[in-house]
Regions:
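Histidine- and acidic-residue-rich, metal-dependent catalytic cores
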Residues: 1-171
């Protein structure tokens, strides 16, 4: 519980550095960006960290989240390309990736189902495998209000969740 507040602060401030860049980052594909735009975008964790450097009220855990939220387990992230970091950073990394996928920030927007599959395929490689399992169990694959097609090819709307994320209650 004592880690909850620093994680929340880090989660809220993790993309603060984006305000200091001009590179496009909404609903874009990395392949469409110029090398200079990618370079500039990859600076945002350092820019965010620098922006809060003198703020005494921000805990070190939160600072690390701001700096490391794009690092990955396999060392493929940025800006430092590290593969060893604390659990608080891994939590925000996973949440940030999911949010990016479904909101179209830093990548093309995809559905919740596609985002969950993408994260699942990266479990143990880019993201903490155990954490991915927990995360997926907490996220509704078909949120209330989602239009779905049943196995009998009938259309329906999700009205509630069940213990099985693949079988919500539909109307």
């Amino acid at each position: 519980e004592e880690l909850l507040l620093p994680i929340a602060i880090g989660g809220l401030l993790h993309d603060l550095g984006i305000r200091y860049i001009t590179a496009p980052y909404e609903d874009c594909n990395w392949d469409e960006l110029t090398p200079n735009e990618i370079f500039e975008f990859k600076k945002h964790p350092i820019l965010g960290y620098t922006a809060i450097e003198e703020e005494k009220w921000i805990p070190d855990v939160s600072r690390n989240i701001i700096l490391y939220h794009h690092e990955r387990m396999d060392g493929s992230g940025f800006p430092l390309k590290q593969n060893s970091f604390e659990v608080s950073c891994r939590i925000v990394q996973l949440c940030d990736a999911f949010d990016s996928y479904i909101s179209g920030v830093e990548c093309r927007r995809i559905s919740i189902q596609e985002a969950l599959e993408k994260i699942k395929s990266q479990a143990g490689i880019m993201f903490d495998g155990e954490m991915v399992g927990e995360f997926i169990s907490l996220i509704a694959k078909y949120p209330v209000g989602t239009t779905v097609k049943t196995s009998e090819e009938e259309n329906g709307v999700v009205i509630s969740q069940t213990d099985d994320p693949d079988h919500p209650i539909i109307m």
